[in-house]
């Protein structure tokens, strides 16, 4: 049976949310781009009013930022963003990934964030596999081509690749900061909450760790 070590990305391997960082780094806040900014506010309101699903909003959000960016080469944009995020990864996390690989674990990056930048990050950190929200480029726009890898979908997508009878769950590890991953943590014999003291206090059965 396989031993696996699963890592979330946003808030776990890096301190902040990568989708917010994507906006801050690439959205052009000039007067010329005001129509796109207004549209982004409108799309965000529709999401919070539950007119859009998280998957629909994510797709619109990504496309609006790409359209407004001063960096017009799509491939160059995501290459730059991957490099930027890699520099933010906690040193503790990097050591853990290396340690698990040395001990024969299959290391998995499991995230709701898109493959647009996670592919390069996953390779850069030496992960065995990436399971995330998948995208395709169709008619000059990015579309989400898989399930949104969030909440219960994370569990579904993980178990799709790693059948329950194939994995030594009791000996395997999971690291996340997100309360939406509570069900995911319950699969593992070694569940860890990263850098979220409040979540840890509510769930004393999970081990809390601080990564820097």
Task: Give the role of each language-model region.
Residues 1-50:
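Active-site neighborhood of HAD-like aspartate-dependent phosphohydrolases
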Residues 2, 83-212:
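C-terminal cap/substrate-recognition subdomain and adjoining C-terminal extension
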Residues 53:
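Glycine-rich adenosine-cofactor-binding loop
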């Amino acid at each position: 049976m396989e031993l696996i070590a699963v890592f979330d990305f946003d808030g776990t391997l890096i301190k902040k949310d990568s989708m917010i960082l994507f906006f801050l780094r690439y959205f052009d806040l000039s007067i010329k781009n005001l129509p796109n900014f207004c549209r982004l506010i409108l799309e965000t309101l529709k999401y919070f009013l539950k007119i859009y699903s998280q998957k629909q909003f994510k797709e619109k959000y990504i496309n609006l930022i790409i359209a407004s960016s001063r960096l017009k080469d799509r491939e160059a944009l995501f290459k730059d963003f991957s490099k930027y995020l890699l520099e933010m990864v906690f040193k503790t996390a990097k050591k853990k990934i290396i340690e698990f690989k040395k001990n024969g674990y299959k290391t998995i990056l499991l995230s709701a964030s898109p493959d647009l930048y996670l592919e390069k990050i996953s390779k850069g950190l030496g992960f065995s596999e990436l399971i995330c929200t998948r995208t395709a480029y169709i008619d000059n726009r990015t579309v989400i081509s898989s399930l949104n890898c969030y909440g219960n979908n994370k569990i579904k997508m993980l178990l799709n690749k790693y059948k329950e009878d194939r994995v030594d769950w009791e000996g395997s590890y999971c690291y996340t900061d997100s309360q939406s991953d509570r069900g995911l943590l319950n699969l593992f014999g070694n569940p860890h909450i990263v850098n979220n003291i409040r979540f840890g206090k509510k769930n004393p059965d999970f081990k809390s760790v601080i990564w820097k």
